[in-house]
Every structure is written in C-alpha cells, then in structure tokens.
Amino acid sequence: MFSQKIKCKVFADLHQQDDVFLIPNPWDIGSAKVLQGLGFKALATTSSGLAYTLGRADGEVTLEEKLFHCSELAANTTIPINADFENGFADDPETVAHNVLKVANTGIAGCSIEDFSRDALSLYDLDRKSVV
C-alpha cells in the first residue's frame, strides 16, 4: 500500500506536468478499483455519486459519511484521491479549515472546496472565499 505522503507527491507532480490528466469520479470502492485498473493516475470523489448510492439527492450526505467514503476509497486504492468536499461542510472559514484537516486525515491526496452556500444556493462573497 502506498503511503499518503507518496500519493500526495504523485498528485502534486500530476499538476506540474506539461500534459493534462483525466481524473474520473468513482462512486464506490468497486468503481474506484475498475478506474484504477484502467490506468488512471488519480481519482476524485463525486458528491452526487455518493449521495445517489445512498438513495439521496446531491448535497444530502453528512460530513461523517463523506469522511468514511474518502477513507474507504483511499484505503482501497494505490493512486491519489481528490475529495469533492462540497462547501467544506460549513459556511464559516474556520470550520471549513477544521473539516479540511479531518478529510486530510482520511488518506486522500487533495480536496476541492466549492464556493457556494448550501442554504442560499448562491456563491459566497469574495471576502469570505479569500479567507479560506
């Protein structure tokens, strides 16, 4: 099993290469293993895919469920995983930062934070985004 440190290095290197790389979205361990077997260099979680496998709409997955999902994918693959971490499961930058530390501890190599508020379904203002 590759360490998280190695996966993070591989993921950073992918972003520095001259060529583009595709990063498909597995929704469970099985699809992650298939995509890894097809030769993809990295994977990214899908918030909607996870929600649908749980019989819910996109945006209805809890932080705890997302953390478990990320840890399962990271533990069952040897390539970097980037987490679709929605809005960081919080509206304030401090809680987002705390939650990013939690997801980092699952073994993933990176995460993406969206710039929208779940309640208002609108974009955060620029001042708030720049703090994060």
Describe the residue ranges of each PLM region.
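N-terminal amphipathic alpha-helix/helix-capping segment at the start of soluble metabolic enzymes
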Residues: 1-25, 29-37
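Short, well-ordered coil/turn segments that N-cap beta-strands
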Residues: 18-21, 40-41, 77-81, 108-109
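Catalytic cores of alpha/beta
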Residues: 31-34, 89-102
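Glycine-rich, proline-tolerant flexible connector loops at the mouths of alpha/beta enzymes
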Residues: 42-67, 87-93, 111-128
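Glycine-rich beta-to-alpha transition loops that act as phosphate-gripper elements at the mouths
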Residues: 24-27, 79-93
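Conserved, mostly hydrophobic/aromatic
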Residues: 28, 35, 73, 84, ...
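Conserved small/polar residues in nucleotide/adenosyl-binding loops
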Residues: 131-132
